[in-house]
Amino acid sequence: MKTTISVIKADIGSLAGHHIVHPDTMAAANKVLASAKEQGIILDYYITHVGDDLQLIMTHTRGELDTKVHETAWNAFKEAAKVAKDLGLYAAGQDLLSDSFSGNVRGLGPGVAEMEIEERASEPIAIFMADKTEPGAYNLPLYKMFADPFNTPGLVIDPTMHGGFKFEVLDVYQGEAVMLSAPQEIYDLLALIGTPARYVIRRVYRNEDNLLAAVVSIERLNLIAGKYVGKDDPVMIVRLQHGLPALGEALEAFAFPHLVPGWMRGSHYGPLMPVSQRDAKATRFDGPPRLLGLGFNVKNGRLVGPTDLFDDPAFDETRRLANIVADYMRRHGPFMPHRLEPTEMEYTTLPLILEKLKDRFKKESDVYKAKESIYAKEESQGHD
């Protein structure tokens, strides 16, 4: 019997702005999932939150993209959104981009990470959930976990990991994916994933047997909705131990609070701060971007746990550095590199400002006109 782990999240409304999920909305979602468990649709579940995002962690035997499981999640979000509206919570139902369910929640707003696995004798997993950032935020940590021996010594000293891992990288603008193997193709891999707004690691497999090791939600809300409706706040499932990164190696990848896009109004770079459940809320400048990690064991579809992975003084220095970096970045105000690059601002007010001012721009004959970027050329010409 194969077990499917599904992590589905959505911003359905939050208390005091983009701050924290209200417990009454979690209770509403719990009723829906409890009913689904009684009916045998799901085997087990756990509900949590990161900032303003409601997180549903479910196990079942129905495979990925199952209609009944996704409908259960959709109904849970809809019921939670109703409560949010009754309470007058901010941005109630923000991530629910459609009024009706159509088979699965892909493209409807919620973020989805799922993996169908053959359970090992012991199946430890870590589930990472971020707020105020986008899927590419996991590119650097995933590279560290599965391709960097300075982070993961198991790549060197564990015979079952020595063959390396391959990365499925998605071009979110073109909807195309490429598989790149490490260590053989790490330079090509880095050339792509170093542009995380466009190239996102979606899945990681072990080279020797194609064992699925990690999966990331890749929904870009602005690309789905055609306008800014909030950041994507990605989730990620990582399998651990027994020929995969140890828990400590997976967590080590987040010891450096690297800069990620998102933060205030989804338009600023800031440090990704790993936090405990009690600190998984947006505060300063609607952030800084937060990361919650929960650890489980999965046994016959049952979720054993969780444990709060970043609730430990070992990450105090990471958080301290994140606060220093946050302060440094904030002092740039509305200037780059704190503010995102123009291509990432096209779903904010910037296009409206340019439209308003277009008649006031005058041609200057003695000024050299810069060439288009390589990405602008690609998008104007398309692929053959």
UniProtKB/Swiss-Prot annotation:
Record text on cofactor binding: Can also use Zn(2+) or Mn(2+) in vitro, although with much less efficiency than Mg(2+).
Metal-binding listed as a keyword: yes
EC number: 3.1.3.11, 4.1.2.13
Annotated positions binding Mg(2+) 2: D52, D53, D131, D233
Residue positions of the active site: D11 (proton acceptor), Y228 (proton donor/acceptor), K231 (schiff-base intermediate with dhap)
GO biological process: dephosphorylation; gluconeogenesis; NADPH regeneration
UniProt xrefs under Pfam families: FBPase_3
Stated family: Belongs to the FBP aldolase/phosphatase family.
Protein name from the UniProt record: Fructose-1,6-bisphosphate aldolase/phosphatase
Gene source species: Sulfurisphaera tokodaii (strain DSM 16993 / JCM 10545 / NBRC 100140 / 7)
Lineage: Archaea, Thermoproteota, Thermoprotei, Sulfolobales, Sulfolobaceae
Gene expressing this chain: fbp
